[in-house]
């Protein structure tokens, strides 16, 4: 590069340096002016009013969000409760009907106990078949007979009518069944009425 070119280059750089310096000063002045204009705007009454409105709107939005969360939780609880009630209605819907039929089963059992096998064997056989059909029909609806003779007393399924000493029987065991119990699925419809042995 010739000396003349170097001088020209230096001159060009210096001129541009001055231009950049002037541009930077102008930008700084504009920034200062903007900040001077902004400072009074923050204290302006309309700005304060807008800030209060924004705060109130944020509070209202938060309240509405909390309400919606609570409403969704309540809706979920109602849905679960309804599902449980529908399932129970399907499972235990026949409970009233079965409770109404239990006295018929009791009457058939008493008739079988009182019928003399020697007097009329066909009648005894007919009662046995009727009883079997009845119990089979109940089993189709998940009804189970509770006949606890010889078992340990269970207050969840048995109702103790009295307690008696019973030689040879373990204590707290069922020695006599007055009336058999019934349960539908896992729910006891009627507890078995029993006499329990003492020590």
From Swiss-Prot:
UniProt-listed InterPro entries: GrpE, GrpE_coiled_coil, GrpE_head
Keywords carried by this UniProt record: Chaperone, Cytoplasm, Stress response
Gene Ontology cellular component list: cytosol
UniProt cross-references to Pfam families, sorted A to Z: GrpE (PF01025)
Ranges of Basic and acidic residues composition bias in the record: 1-24
UniProt GO BP: protein folding
Location in the cell: Cytoplasm
Ranges for region Disordered: 1-52
GO function term, MF aspect, one: adenyl-nucleotide exchange factor activity
Self-association and partners: Homodimer.
Family: Belongs to the GrpE family.
The protein's role, per its UniProt record: Participates actively in the response to hyperosmotic and heat shock by preventing the aggregation of stress-denatured proteins, in association with DnaK and GrpE. It is the nucleotide exchange factor for DnaK and may function as a thermosensor. Unfolded proteins bind initially to DnaJ; upon interaction with the DnaJ-bound protein, DnaK hydrolyzes its bound ATP, resulting in the formation of a stable complex. GrpE releases ADP from DnaK; ATP binding to DnaK triggers the release of the substrate protein, thus completing the reaction cycle.
Protein name: Protein GrpE
